[in-house]
Amino acid sequence: MTVTYTARVAKARFGGFSKLLLLWRGSIYKLLWRELLCFLGLFMALSAAYRFVLTEEQKRYFEKLVLYCDRYASLIPVSFVLGFYVTLVVHRWWNQYLSMPLTDALMCVVVGTVHGHDERGRLYRRTLMRYAGLSGVLILRSVSTAVFKRFPTIDHVVEAGFMTREERKKFENLNSSYNKYWVPCVWFCNLAAQARREGRIRDNGAFKLLLEELNVFRSKCGMLFHYDWISVPLVYTQVVTIAVYSYFLACLIGRQFLDPAQGYKDHDLDLCVPIFTLLQFFFYAGWLKVAEQLINPFGEDDDDFETNFLIDRCFQVSMLAVDEMYDDLAMLEKDLYWDAAEARAPYTAATAFLMQQPSFQGSTFDITLAKEDMQFQRQDGLEAPLNEAHGDFLQRLLPVGTGMGTGGLLGRRVPLLRRKNSHVSEESMAASCACAGAPDGAVPECGCEGPLVDLGQPEPESEPITGPESPALVPAPRAPSEPLTVVPLSGTRGPAPPWLPSPIGEEEESLA
């Protein structure tokens, strides 16, 4: 039932998609022609009534109604609602196909883990795959109308060979009111455990791999059941349907051609068939039809999933793989390129031009650089000290205005930040350098006359000062130098920016 046109668009050419417009099976014309004819018929009926049935007074009232509907019909968000809805439906549609219970991976694990050339080993492998196929049939007949019509009862499943009569008795004797598609998976596990006890499955690793692959298969069956149970919320579908139908109901009236003699705006042309309105109906209503067809791909539409084909294919291929192909290997022999240094498959005359194309090495392999740009640079001295980097960064960020120049607030706050981000002050660093440079027993140049401090060891943390009030800051003794010159500020200092931390401002006030 799937419409496949992949071969028709294998090569992009002039009018490539145009040929697809002539297809009927699975086309939008097949889905929409009834609605399109109904809309066109109603439109023509209203147009004929306006022209030949209504009186002059009634025509004036109808014209006002047409202008009103045409003005406010655009308030309905048809494109917005339809876009999200169709995206949701298409994503759900593809995920449902990915949840189809295919047995290919499971049959490969069975043929590689369940061993035995005798009849019992063959019976184990075939029965395991038959249980997997039975579980797929049970879930598909629960969600697909096409599969249900093929297997309407359990008797039909038994007659088709997916279940024996003894298994049917055990299946029907299970006291459960829920869907029992999972029962064959449990039979699969029990039979695999029995094969492990008999040594048909040689180790626990292979047994674990077999059960893990079965759980993947069973989870896909469960996902199909949940997709069938949990639909797209009904309110969403109702909103989209009402939006589309109400919009085109308003277009039936609002898109009517009025008498040009009345002088209405944008009504200078009098036609009978609304061409662009029909195109708009074709696109929007067709968009809704796409969602209507894809919302349940397990029906009998032209583009629904080929569930019966998948059942037949999986059953035949799985039985062939675990039975006739078990341990069936061709004789090992050297390949054609055994002695070749470079293995390269030949090309036909139609594809010989591909041999001339260079292999792709990466998008950067064609980039060329100048010789001076390829010289390595020394890393010495490229990184500035941390405190200087902080200062430069703040110099770029802080605004400069009245009272905030180099000698104003900015010049006072940056040294404070440097002192707060360092372990010692600048004066202490200078004194430490002087003390460190003094010889043993000599008086340091800093004049502190204290014991020399080893700068290699971290200073012990000072204990917090307890008391009702903290002592005032006492400046360190300064070495004799030139007298200080006090330079008054060029203006009043402005208020501190609100983004600066308050402790910095408080420390500045105490220092002032």
Swiss-Prot record:
Residues 453-512 are annotated as: Disordered. Keywords: Cell membrane, Chloride, Chloride channel, Ion channel, Ion transport, Membrane, Transmembrane, Transmembrane helix, Transport. Ca(2+) binds at A10, Q293, N296, D301, D304. GO terms for cellular component: basolateral plasma membrane; chloride channel complex; plasma membrane. It is a multi-pass membrane protein. It is found in: Cell membrane; Basolateral cell membrane. It comes from the Eukaryota. It holds the Pfam family Bestrophin. InterPro entries: Bestrophin (IPR000615), Bestrophin-like (IPR021134). The keyword Transmembrane helix applies. The keyword Transport applies. PANTHER family: BESTROPHIN (PTHR10736), BESTROPHIN-2 (PTHR10736:SF1). The C-terminal auto-inhibitory segment (AS) modulates the open/closed conformation of the channel and determines paralog specificity among bestrophins. In a closed conformation, the C-terminal auto-inhibitory segment constricts the channel concentrically by wrapping around the channel periphery in an inter-protomer manner. Ligand-gated anion channel that allows the movement of anions across cell membranes when activated by calcium (Ca2+). Transports a large specter of anions, namely mediates the movement of chloride, L-glutamate and iodide. Calcium-binding triggers the dilation of the aperture, but calcium-dependent gating is only effective when the size of the passing anion is bigger than the closed aperture. Mediates the calcium-activated hydrogencarbonate movement and participates in colonic hydrogencarbonate secretion concomitant with mucin secretion. Pentamer. Interacts with GLUL; this interaction tethers a fraction of GLUL to the membrane, causing a decrease of cytosolic glutamine synthase (GS) activity and inhibits the chloride channel activity of BEST2 by affecting the gating at the aperture in the absence of intracellular glutamate. Belongs to the anion channel-forming bestrophin (TC 1.A.46) family. Calcium-sensitive chloride channel subfamily. This is Bestrophin-2. It comes from Bos taurus (Bovine). The gene is BEST2.
